């Protein structure tokens, strides 16, 4: 009886293995963005684009006025969720675009961190440099995203 159970268990394992290995075809990774995917990405793009506009409208003036307390507050306040939003969006892109988007997002964060340090040190020239570089990388990130037609 125990030999029969062992044999039955072995047969069930083999049948299960064959069924699992043959059951699902390989999923093909898309190479272009579908209109549905672009619409889905636009939900994530909008807050990031608003943050980019806010940088140009508000943060630039704070740096020009050398208002360092409000500069730091703006970086930690309205731009505080930017890291999460940009990395989340980068992860939603096609695999061919993900690495570049993640790299650009990290560069934007690096510039914002250095801008925050420059504001803390009240270093206007370094703050302006980091601000310009952050905008350039931010624009490169946004240009990498698919556009709704």
Curated annotation (Swiss-Prot):
The keyword 4Fe-4S does not apply. GO terms for cellular component: extrinsic component of membrane; photosystem II oxygen evolving complex; plasma membrane-derived thylakoid membrane; plasma membrane-derived thylakoid photosystem II. Gene3D superfamilies: Oxygen-evolving enhancer protein 3 (PsbQ), four-helix up-down bundle. It holds the Pfam family PsbQ. It is a lipid-anchor. Keywords: Lipoprotein, Membrane, Metal-binding, Palmitate, Photosynthesis, Photosystem II, Signal, Thylakoid. Addition of an 8-His tag to the C-terminus of this protein allows purification of intact photosystem II (PSII) on a Ni(2+) affinity column. PSII purified this way has more PsbV and a higher Mn content (reflecting presence of the oxygen evolving complex) than PSII purified via His tagged-PsbB on Ni(2+) affinity columns, and has more O(2) evolving activity. Residues 1-21 form the signal peptide. A lipid is attached at residue 22 (S-diacylglycerol cysteine). Disruption phenotype: Wild-type growth in BG11 medium, at 30 degrees Celsius with 30 umol photons/m(2)/s; slightly reduced growth in Ca(2+) or Cl(-) depleted medium. Up to 60% decreased rates of O(2) evolution. Wild-type growth in BG11 medium, at 30 degrees Celsius with 25 umol photons/m(2)/s, wild-type growth under Ca(2+), Cl(-) or iron-limiting conditions, about 10% decrease in O(2) evolution rate; slightly slower growth in double psbO-psbQ or psbQ-psbU mutants, no growth of psbQ-psbV mutants. Increased accumulation of intermediate assembly forms of PSII. It is found in: Cellular thylakoid membrane. Induction: Transcribed constitutively under all conditions tested. The N-terminus is blocked. Upon expression in E.coli the N-terminus is modified with a diacylglycerol and an acyl group bound to two palmitates and one palmitoleate. It comes from the Bacteria. GO terms for biological process: photosynthesis. A lipid is attached at residue 22 (N-palmitoyl cysteine). PROSITE patterns: PROKAR_LIPOPROTEIN. GO terms for molecular function: calcium ion binding. Belongs to the PsbQ family. CyanoQ subfamily. PSII is composed of 1 copy each of membrane proteins PsbA, PsbB, PsbC, PsbD, PsbE, PsbF, PsbH, PsbI, PsbJ, PsbK, PsbL, PsbM, PsbT, PsbX, PsbY, PsbZ, Psb30/Ycf12, peripheral proteins PsbO, CyanoQ (PsbQ), PsbU, PsbV and a large number of cofactors. It forms dimeric complexes. Pull-down experiments with His-tagged PsbQ pull down dimeric, but not monomeric, PSII. When crystallized in the presence of Zn(2+) this protein dimerizes, but neither Zn-binding nor dimerization are thought to be physiologically relevant. One of the extrinsic, lumenal subunits of photosystem II (PSII), which stabilize and protect the oxygen-evolving complex. PSII is a light-driven water plastoquinone oxidoreductase, using light energy to abstract electrons from H(2)O, generating a proton gradient subsequently used for ATP formation. Plays a role in the stability of the oxygen-evolving center on the luminal side of PSII. Required for optimal photoautotrophic growth in the absence of Ca(2+) or Cl(-), functions in optimizing PSII water oxidation/O(2) evolving activity. Requires PsbO to bind to PSII. This is CyanoQ. The lineage of its organism: Bacteria, Bacillati, Cyanobacteriota, Cyanophyceae, Synechococcales.
